[in-house]
Curated annotation (Swiss-Prot):
NCBIfam families: mutH_TIGR (TIGR02248), PRK05070.1 (NF003458). It comes from Escherichia coli O17:K52:H18 (strain UMN026 / ExPEC). This is DNA mismatch repair protein MutH. Keywords: Cytoplasm, DNA damage, DNA repair, Endonuclease, Hydrolase, Nuclease. GO terms for cellular component: cytoplasm. It is found in: Cytoplasm. Belongs to the MutH family. The gene is mutH. Sequence-specific endonuclease that cleaves unmethylated GATC sequences. It is involved in DNA mismatch repair. Pfam families: MutH. It comes from the Bacteria.
Length: 229
């Protein structure tokens, strides 16, 4: 079997993207890094996004940190998801930054969250810390769109959370709000403040927030598609 090679340009079809992702299944991160001419860090403490960057290189992703999807031409977002030995997610999944101002007229249908989750290529990766980073294997990919029930679940949480933001209650939002979708601070340091609406409608400064999918949502999603018991 010939070794896979990174895509040098963005994939032109979903089929090409999925076929390339399937070729990576079973390889370790160390093997994929070496084949791409990259050095594998000892751990992810200083390189938190390294796995995502590695897989973006292999799959020809184009967006980087821009607001559009990773595969903008296909409308597909790439999400790597660390899993345990039973294939269950080990952490929540970042979706996008939560807008804290300028939200008048925004609906679920036009929201950034829905745009990012419209079509997702999920790639599970072994994530248990007992496995050295270079030895963690890449799992089988899944190309997913939310079904009617999943869309409803996400919409209800999004509407509840956005109502709180618009009504000046952003500081009262905790990770427990939302059944499947949560908002929590997203900042490398506590000095990175952004504008938001306060309880009396005034402008306040607060930590940037991000939308995250809770583990119960991604766990059910993976279990249903991979028949994990």
């Amino acid at each position: 079997m010939s070794q896979p090679r990174p895509l040098l340009s963005p994939p032109e079809t979903e089929e090409q993207l999925l076929a390339q992702a399937q070729q990576l299944s079973g390889y370790t991160l160390g093997e994929l890094a070496a084949l791409a001419g990259l050095v594998t860090p000892e751990n992810l403490k200083r390189d938190k996004g390294w796995i995502g960057v590695l897989l973006e290189i292999w799959l020809g992703a184009s967006a980087g940190s821009k607001p559009e999807q990773d595969f903008a031409g296909l409308g597909v977002e790439l999400k790597t998801i660390p899993v345990d030995s039973l294939g269950r997610p080990l952490e929540t999944t970042f979706v996008c930054v939560a807008p804290l101002t300028g939200n008048s007229g925004v609906t679920w249908e036009t929201s950034h969250v829905r745009h990012k989750l419209k079509r997702v290529l999920w790639i599970p990766v072994e994530g248990e810390r007992s496995i050295p980073l270079a030895q963690r294997r890449v799992g089988s990919p899944l190309l997913w769109s939310p079904n009617e029930e999943e869309d409803r679940q996400l919409r209800e949480d999004w509407e509840e959370l956005m109502d709180m933001i618009v009504l000046g209650q952003v500081e009262r939002i905790t990770a427990r709000h939302g059944e499947y979708l949560q908002i929590r601070p997203k900042a490398a340091n506590a000095k990175a403040l952004t504008e938001a609406i306060g309880a009396r409608g005034e402008r306040i400064l607060t930590l940037p927030r991000g939308f995250y999918l809770k583990k119960n949502f991604t766990s059910a999603l993976l279990a249903r598609h991979f028949l994990i018991q």
